[in-house]
Amino acid sequence: MVQENNNTQSKWTDSQRQVIDENYHHILVSAGAGAGKTAVLVQRIISKLIDPHDDLTVNGLLVVTFTEKAANEMRDRIARELKKALSQDPENDHLKKQLYLLNKANISTLHSFCLEILRHYFYYLDIDPAFSVASEYDVELLRQSVIDNYLEEEYGLGEQSFYLLVDSYGGDKNDEKLKKMILTLHRFSRSHPRPRKWLQSVKDHFEVSTDDDLTNTVYYLEIQKDIETLFKQCINYFKRALQTSEQPGGPYQYAETLLEEIEQVQNFTQQLVEVENHSFDWNSFAERVAGFKFSKLPSVSKNDDVDEDLKKDCKKLRDHGKKTFQKLVQNYFTRSKDELLRDLQQLSPLMNKLIDMVINMDDKYEEVKKQRGIMDFSDLEHYVYELLDQYPEIVSELHQRYDEVMVDEYQDINQVQNAILEKLTGQQSISPDLFMVGDVKQSIYRFRLAEPELFLNKYDTFDQRSEEGSLIELQENFRSSPMVLESVNYLFSRIMTGSLSGIEYNEKVKLIPASKPRELYLNEDDNEDDKYEGQAENENQVIDGRTEVHLLENKDTNSREEDTEREAQLIATTINSLVEEEYRIYDRDLDDYRKLDYSDFVILSRKTKEQAELVTNVFQEHGVPLYAELDTGYFAAQEVQVMLSLLKIIDNPRQDIPLAGVLRSPLVGLDSNELVEIRRSNPGTDYYEACKRVLTNSIEQQNQCSEKTIQKMQKFFSQLERWRRISRERSLAELIWDIYQITDYLDYVAGFPGGRERQANLWSFYDRALQFDSFSHSGLVKFLNFIEKLVEQDFDLGKARTVSENENVVRLMSIHKSKGLEFPVVFVMGLGNNFNFNDQKGDLLLHKDLGLGPKLVDLTNRIKYPTIAHQAIKGSLGRETLAEEMRILYVAMTRAEEKLFLVGSGKDIESKISVPEEPAAAQNYLDWIYPQLGEDSELFHKIWNDIPGQQDGKSVEYNWKSYFESLLSQTFTWEVDQEEFEDQKRTLEQAISYSYPYNIATEIVGKMSVTDLAKSDTYIDSKIVSQNQSLSSVQDHYKKLAATQIPMFLETTEDAGDNKYESYKEHHTPSKRPEFLKSNSGLTGAEAGTSIHLAFQHLPINSDLNSQEFSEEQISNQLDDLVNKEIITQAQRDVISEDLIMKFFQSELGQAILERPKGLKRELPFTLGVPAWEMLAGSEECQAELEAENIETTELQGLSDETVVIQGVIDYLFWDGTNYYLIDFKTDKLNTSNMDEIEKRLQGKYRMQIQMYLRAITEIFNITPTKAYLYHVPTGNWIQVE
């Protein structure tokens, strides 16, 4: 995975040069995917800064990016180019000044810019200058608290309009639906520059009379657009049916009927235009449309020589058209104009009350925020807009400060952000120029209220240096191969139309390959569908560059989970084959072909949250390393679920499901049989009561369950009572910390797969509790209610991240997260999953222009039905959803560099290919892809895959579960030979009584970490214990230690045990002290060392940071980013010195790494088998012990069949283009500053460890490092290990 490849060529294309040189007041650059827009934007800045005729300085620029990461990368690129220019003109004082000013330049997100403006001009508004910006989690906490308190007040007032609103929209059991409605409308209103003005204007939409003309309502134009769209769909279906009837062998008898139906629907469409002539009568039009009846098709006899398949296709197309027409009638033409307007009248008081409540709630929300001295992100933009709107002197100052405002990713801004930019760059002669770059085809943040229409409005009005502004197109694509681009262009030229997406995908915007031609040797047999199933014909086989569409037929089930599993099976099998058979792929950086790695693959999905666990399980079965990059899944994590269940029963233990879950969890450890014992012993009661009775009866010597079960229960319920008491007396965070301490749950989860992530999730859970405690009205009950609301609202915190982007794993990520990235091979899965139209299903729909679209609730008959407002907004949202999904598919397909796989499951696939849906009627991505898969399609390689569960190229359902259950149900018996049994018994007895001749070797564990070897000089010699001393006695003494750690603490003296165990606890128990239990905030030495290792492991070293640009400030920003990503904690961040890291990268080898970041491999894990006798013979102290025990060294060689398994992780392995270098970081605190002494100590301590590293690299990776170094971080000393 790499960042978007921005063209760094010295020779720019004509269009790129135009972008760099264009001087105009307003410029819009429409940059297609992979067009190198970032490089062009940087070059435009550099050209202006180094131009002696341009007075622009870097602090005269305002550069707005979408993310802080993009801002940092932009700043780094500008710094590199400035230094490059300065190296050519070292005496240029102007360039020196620009480089100095760069760190203070306004290159940031719009939020950061707004924050700076408010810090500077706070005194104009009633703002606390010491305000802080609250996290999204804190904001949600506060909003929930405010709405709860506000609704209590409303209930107390008892207004009729309020109770009518609650009865209509509050829900059956409580008022949660109304709460959600108010909060949703409040958040939605904040996307407008003047939220309250917009809310008040919405009230006017319902001020109508039955005497009014329907066409004068705000909703009519949207209704007209929706009706026209559906009419056109009908006509297209009928026309396609007509074309089918006219084919040779087609049902020509249907042609006349189809022509009549086409003509009638076209007449209906034309009549809609009459509204412009003021002669449109809704009621009469509705009657005509609703009264239209379709004729019966003429019969076709067997003697008419009609192809049966064409006849079926023709009927299917006509049926599609008829269903679309019937849907249209049902939606719009079953009620009169007066009834439609009367609905709006009825809704007026309810909507007025709802809007008033949103405004009142906002008042209270603002008041609480001011009391706390906090703002949310929305406040930053609204306050700045208020400043610019009300205080022209501020605008004038900013006009004088900035010469040009540059906006990256302009397609993703919202209305408030655009309003701010317009204030900053007005049409006055003194206002700064506005430069905007983006790609509306990649606008995929509608859920964040982004407005692609803002881009489209300028795109439609700007021209080559028109009065409104200048438009420049960047079509050249420097990322993808011509084959990938051909498939993208082919598909979107057929589905992306102005009416459906707002932009026409034509010659003006299609992607043009910019990569240079390269030699490619295709396989001899190019048409084998199973080319990845068998052995490659030669080891230099190059991956086929055609886009492949893999279709999985699903006949018997609607299970999305099963579809996902089968698609994952296909993808995992394909990836394994491509990697194991050593297919090659072109690498731009090498300008040559190389073998595929797992890290070359990404799987993109629209619904990653739902699919991650299923895909991960399948990949584990196939042995393919996979990392699912999610911002979700936190609340579903098993360890978090256990903690939530425990908190629920601490609040109220009479909850059967949470209680059973905790009892079954590792916190208690009952198995399913024990749970059944408890229930059987006390049926008819709640589970808590059943447990209490079991415990009571055990005291009275009437045991109903086993003694083992009772002991577990007694221990847990004693703890439970204690925790219930703590919950009433102490804070939530203290309660959770006590649970962690008593149960050792943090340590327990570390032993499972993904242990680091599980621990991080539990730490995050504790941190959330700390945050919650900081709010008023906190407590266990409110915390649980709050979490429940977050889950209901699909608000997820995201699992902690513990995998870096440098690891050789396949990535699974959402399409949204992949934006701006590129990958050699891309799989887009789940293409048969239906689009999410949930925003069109609620009782109240919201739209930026149309306002509110409520359903009308008939309280008397307890029914609800859609209004004209609801239907208008539903139609508009439906079109916007399809446009967004089309752009999302475009983003997914344009991530691929060399190879694109499209994978989807569906029913009746062949039928849908022959009779596809209209693009505007698509329900999923496959509906857009099916029409492109006809027999004449050469750009898409269509494949039905032979994977488990499929036969003869077509899908069949295979019930794996039933198969395994049938095996388990079988009874297997063996006849036992008594004589043979006695022989085996004697053999076993001999084995048990056997005395191992090399007992000294048992003191070396069978599996150990390489870091243990650092202690080998004080380790192996102390393992030569007396033959009379049993290992079991030592194990008993250290029974809490893992077997692999026992040798580290064995000593030759009898009284060393206790001290050694305490030493182990100090150095190996993670520091888990929360702030309220700490005497200070420091970490132990071991923890500090781990923190520094994590920093070197995860710092993003990429091609944008060379030796000149790597600064302490950048390191500081990157460390802060690791905290934000929860890779390191703030406490760990505090002990990491930027200076220490800088010292490493300023060294000769550190500089080489920055110059060639792709040559660096970090955190390489390995497992190595080493003969046990080598481990013993390698120590001088061991030799002395052998002599003392009269044991010959040759005796050790008898252990050659015994193997010690060594596990380790190599910190850095670096290839500079010629040689490999092994680097291992050490943070030992030594009580000397003498460099020779430091070198001697570290070499002696770690020599064996480094030798194992070198051996592993040579044997496993087939690489021989030229040199191996220890790097002592505290002193910056490089120590070569021979």
Swiss-Prot record:
GO BP of this protein: double-strand break repair via homologous recombination
Cystine pairings recorded for this chain: none
GO MF terms, alphabetically ordered: 3'-5' DNA helicase activity; 3'-5' exonuclease activity; ATP binding; ATP hydrolysis activity; double-stranded DNA binding
InterPro entries attached to this UniProt entry: AddA (IPR014152), DNA_helicase_UvrD-like_C (IPR014017), DNA_helicase_UvrD/REP (IPR000212), P-loop_NTPase (IPR027417), PDDEXK-like_dom_sf (IPR011604), PDDEXK_AddAB-type (IPR038726), Restrct_endonuc-II-like (IPR011335), UvrD-like_ATP-bd (IPR014016)
Gene Ontology CC terms, in alphabetical order: cytosol; DNA helicase complex
EC number(s) per entry: 3.1.-.-, 5.6.2.4
Required cofactor names: Mg(2+)
Catalysed reactions listed for this entry: Couples ATP hydrolysis with the unwinding of duplex DNA by translocating in the 3'-5' direction; ATP + H2O = ADP + phosphate + H(+)
Database matches in PROSITE patterns: UVRD_HELICASE_ATP_BIND (PS51198), UVRD_HELICASE_CTER (PS51217)
Domain spans labelled UvrD-like helicase C-terminal: 516-820
The UvrD-like helicase ATP-binding domain, residue ranges: 10-481
Binding annotation for ATP: A31, G32, A33, G34, A35, G36, K37, T38
Alphabetic keyword roster: ATP-binding, DNA damage, DNA repair, DNA-binding, Exonuclease, Helicase, Hydrolase, Isomerase, Nuclease, Nucleotide-binding
Family: Belongs to the helicase family. AddA subfamily.
Subunit structure: Heterodimer of AddA and AddB/RexB.
Function summary: The heterodimer acts as both an ATP-dependent DNA helicase and an ATP-dependent, dual-direction single-stranded exonuclease. Recognizes the chi site generating a DNA molecule suitable for the initiation of homologous recombination. The AddA nuclease domain is required for chi fragment generation; this subunit has the helicase and 3' -> 5' nuclease activities.
Protein name, UniProt field: ATP-dependent helicase/nuclease subunit A
